[in-house]
Amino acid sequence: MLDFNKIKEVAQGYQADMTAFLRAIVKNPGESCDEKAHVETIAAEMKKLDFDEVVIDPQGNVIGYMGTGDKIIAFDGHIDTVGIGNINNWTFDPYDGYENETEIGGRGVSDQCGGVVSAVYGAKIMKDYNLIPEGYK
């Protein structure tokens, strides 16, 4: 098993990729019942990261698997957002967002697309470093 500091170091190496992935999700509106662009962006990233299986179910959920066992380790997160309201109330384009050394802003970044991005890359790190227990996916 890797120690936490090594895992953190590996994760920091993906910071630019994770930031680009999050910004790609945010670029598209994703209001409830209209998240198709978010789903497709997440599925494409999972495939790029060599998930063992990527499924978009009939309800439009994207499900990615790392590992091939019968037991499941799951992270569940929503990717829909609320509307932007009056665009004139924003100090930046909520779909273009902004980024500086410490923050990324945009519609859905903190609720909850950023968490989904972290989970996708967390699964990649788990697979790359053999941290998925035998019998799990």
Regions from the PLM with identified roles:
Residues 2-109, 128-133:
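Acidic/His- and Gly-rich active-site-bordering loop/insert found
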Residues 112-137:
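Acidic/histidine-rich catalytic neighborhood of metal-dependent amide-processing enzymes
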